[in-house]
Amino acid sequence: MNSVIVIPVLLILLFCFSRFQEVNKVKSYLYLSCVWMLTWLLVFYNNCFVTFISIALLFFMLAFIFKNKRNKIIKLSLFVALAISFFITLFIMLSIFIQSISFFNKVAISEFLFCLKWGHNVVTINEEKIGCFGIAPLLVGTLLITIIAMLVVVPLGLFSAIYISEYASEKVRYIVNTTLQVLSAIPTVVYGYFAVVFLSVFIKQVANFFGLSIHSESALVAGLSIGIMILPFIISLLEDAIRSVPKSLRYGFMALGATPAETIWHITIPYAMPTILSAILLSISRVIGETMIVLMAVGINANLTFNPLNSVTTITVQIATLLTGDQDFNSVQTLAAYALSLVLFIITWLLNAFALFVMKRN
């Protein structure tokens, strides 16, 4: 109730001070002093909501006072937002890099890169028992699941995008795009539940029908689930890429007697190919960073295998596993999560950089 009373009073006082300044040509610093005094009186009012509103009003009134310098204020605000984002990213990168150095001081880089097991053999380094931290099984598992997911999502996404952009009516396009937006908002844990309860059982029944042996937690289940999950994402990207092709090129080629299918194959796809490739690379980055579906559908067993019917694990799953529970921050297991984060960061950064390079070539 006090907040409801104080806020309108503050607004009235601010307006009166503003009019008083304009009429009597009072210096701006006197006006600002009054605004600051009112604001910080409300800060000590011991009400977070009133404090937030009063500070927001302060910045609004500052912008109103310096309306002749509004462009400079907006430019400065945008620069501050950019600087905050940059330094947050830089801080994350530095923290990961520093903790990774601490890990490699305890575990040799050669073991990390070339050991074929993860967490199986127990060795002793500096009188401390730790596991064998070889990233090879994690890289193979990540690569295997990514390949399966992209084999599913690229053909379905490309054909769906072509139909939506070239053949579907406006009503159908609106319904499909709305549905894709809804599907994109579904949490990944729902797709993980779908993979465990339905997809895993279905694939196991199909494999048994053909006489194949398959684990209940397999890379095939995880790859298919992630492919289904990112399908709305890649369809939207590919549709935008196809619709960006100028209509003059299409109509000019069709005026020469080409069919719509020939126009798509010879004009639309080649012209939009750089954007299509960048969309695929961005989708790969999202597949590599997925954690929940893989954790629910595959598990944490780090097996070095290229068989999609066997159980594998990924880099993100091991990061989540190593940081789960009560862990010593300086333990080798915790530091291993930072080393894996560094590898994951480098991989995704290279993919995104290559995607931007492909788009610039367009």
Language-model features and meaning:
Residues 237, 242, 260-298:
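Transmembrane alpha-helices
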Residues 24-28, 71-80, 156-195, 237:
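Cytoplasmic-entry segments and transmembrane alpha-helices of multi-pass inner-membrane transporters
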Residues 1-81, 105-106, 110-129:
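Membrane-topology segments of multi-pass transport proteins
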Residues 169-177, 246-247, 251-278:
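Amphipathic cytosolic juxtamembrane alpha-helices at the membrane-cytosol interface
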Residues 98-101, 105-136, 191-228:
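Membrane-interfacial helix termini and adjacent extracytoplasmic/periplasmic loops
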Residues 18-21, 239-243, 247-250, 254, ...:
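C-terminal transmembrane helix and the adjacent membrane-cytosol boundary/short C-terminal tail
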Residues 207-210, 294-345:
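Interhelical loop and adjacent transmembrane-helix boundary motif
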Residues 44-59, 133-163, 350:
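Transmembrane alpha-helix signature in integral membrane proteins
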